């Protein structure tokens, strides 16, 4: 794995996590 792959994976994980928090927040959980 190179640095670009690791960076891209980290960005996708962070984006998915933040998106999940927004969805859960709007759902009132």
UniProtKB/Swiss-Prot annotation:
GO cellular component: chloroplast thylakoid membrane; cytochrome b6f complex
Subunit relationships: The 4 large subunits of the cytochrome b6-f complex are cytochrome b6, subunit IV (17 kDa polypeptide, PetD), cytochrome f and the Rieske protein, while the 4 small subunits are PetG, PetL, PetM and PetN. The complex functions as a dimer.
Keyword Thylakoid carried by entry: yes
Protein known as: Cytochrome b6-f complex subunit 8
Gene assigned in the entry: petN
Alphabetical UniProt keywords: Chloroplast, Electron transport, Membrane, Photosynthesis, Plastid, Thylakoid, Transmembrane, Transmembrane helix, Transport
Domain of life: Eukaryota
TM annotation in the entry: 3-23
Lineage: Eukaryota, Viridiplantae, Streptophyta, Coleochaetophyceae, Coleochaetales
Membrane-topology descriptor: Single-pass membrane protein
Similarity-based family: Belongs to the PetN family.
Molecular-function annotations in GO: electron transporter, transferring electrons within cytochrome b6/f complex of photosystem II activity
InterPro entries for the chain: Cytochr_b6-f_cplx_su8_sf (IPR036143), Cytochrome_b6-f_cplx_su8 (IPR005497)
SUPFAM superfamilies: PetN subunit of the cytochrome b6f complex
Function description: Component of the cytochrome b6-f complex, which mediates electron transfer between photosystem II (PSII) and photosystem I (PSI), cyclic electron flow around PSI, and state transitions.
Organism, scientific name: Chaetosphaeridium globosum (Charophycean green alga)
Pfam family, any one: PetN
Key word Aminoacyl-tRNA synthetase present: no
Example GO BP: cytochrome complex assembly
Subcellular location as annotated: Plastid, Chloroplast thylakoid membrane
């Amino acid at each position: 794995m190179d640095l670009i792959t690791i960076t891209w994976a980290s960005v996708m994980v962070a984006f998915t996590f933040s998106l999940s928090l927004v969805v859960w927040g709007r759902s009132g959980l």
